[in-house]
Structures are given as structure tokens and as C-alpha cells.
Amino acid sequence: ALNYGFAKPDPRAPWQQPVTAPGPLAVRAELQHIMRYWLERGAAGFRVDMAHSLIKNDPGFRKTNKLWRDIRAMLDREYPDAALVSEWSSPIDAIGAGFHMDFAAQFNAPIFNPLFRAPGDAWGSHGYFNARGDGDALAPLEEYLRHYRATQPRGYISFQSANHDMARMSGGRTLPEIEVAMAFILTMPGVPFIYYGDEIGLRMPD
């Protein structure tokens, strides 16, 4: 595992190095080196898995925010067309930390789960977008608008059709249900993300 440091190290645990220790600083420098390597070869940007979790024992994400703001500053300076996308699932926090956009993903239950999942469904294949009409869009809409108003015009909220952690849109849905859900994802403000295979209606399992 890579050690980006601990915001509040426990002195009883010597492996918990502060973010200013030589090891974590070297890891950050290497991260930027790797990003430059791929950007020089034509990468359009980076999608960061669990972006909020790099620095440990960091209440309020103060040190985590600084890490990403430093990276955003490097991108703005050297690769201004590159996109920095987070799986933070809290657009207010992620965009405040310097990301261009954040997924309204499964971590953020108030937005994602009521729309695309239902309690008790092991595949997570239903939610508001199902023909039974037993979902409720009001609560996720209110939460979405809270994040939208707080982040405009600094960044974007992104809906995704699926990812490696959750079921495909096709799991347990009929074609009309998929069409309505995909139309929502593609027409909401922000930047939509289509999981590979969903563009051709790939069924589960894949």
C-alpha cells in the first residue's frame, strides 16, 4: 500500500507518518510523475477511486484537500485540458478539493441509491427508475440540488450508468426501464459516464 501520510499520527504507531515526512512526500511526488507520464502520452485525465481516502485520520479532509489542490494546480499549470474526476460521492467536498467533477455514486446514498437501487435488492437493480412506480425522486433531487447550487460554476456532478463496484443498468431491468434511466443520466446537467458495454445494452453477468 502507498503511504500518503496521516493527518493526525498516533505516536504509538510508528508507521503512521505525518504528511510532511520524507516517505509520504516522495509518494506524492511520484504520483505527479506518473500522471505526467500518461498525460504526455495522450491521456485525457484521471478518474480517482475513493479520492477522499488517501490521507488517514483526516477529519474534515484538510490534508486530503491540500493534496488534491496541489495536483489540480499542477494540471492547470502544465496540462490545462486534462480532467480530474473523483469517486468521492460528495460533489461539494470533491469540487472544493480541486476536482473538475465528482460522481454522484453509490457512496452517496441520498442521491444515487433512491434513484438506481432499492433496499433488499441484492443486485441493486431497481430504485426510482422502475416500471412499478414505487420509488421516490424527491429526496435525491433535493440532495442533488444542494450539491449543484453549492458547486456551480466551479465543477460538475456526474452520473454513471455503472462501475466495477455495482450492478449494470441492465441488471433486473426491462429495456424501457433502461432507456428511461439512461436518458436521465445523459440529459442531467454535468458530465455523464457510460460504463463499458452499457452503450450496447450488455446484459449481466458480463
Model-found features: residue ranges?
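A short, flexible beta-alpha/helix-coil linker loop
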Residues: 52-55, 165-167
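Conserved structural-core and active-site-/substrate-pathway-adjacent residues in large, well-folded domains
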Residues: 38, 48-49, 164
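A conditional alpha-helix N-cap/helix-loop micro-motif detector
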Residues: 24-28, 64, 138, 174-175
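Hydrophobic residues within beta-strands of alpha/beta enzymes
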Residues: 46-48, 194
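Conserved alpha/beta catalytic core and glycan-binding cleft of carbohydrate-active enzymes
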Residues: 72-206
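Substrate-binding/active-site clefts of carbohydrate-active enzymes
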Residues: 1-41, 59-60, 67-71, 77, ...
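Short, solvent-exposed loop/turn segments at secondary-structure boundaries
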Residues: 58-62, 171-173
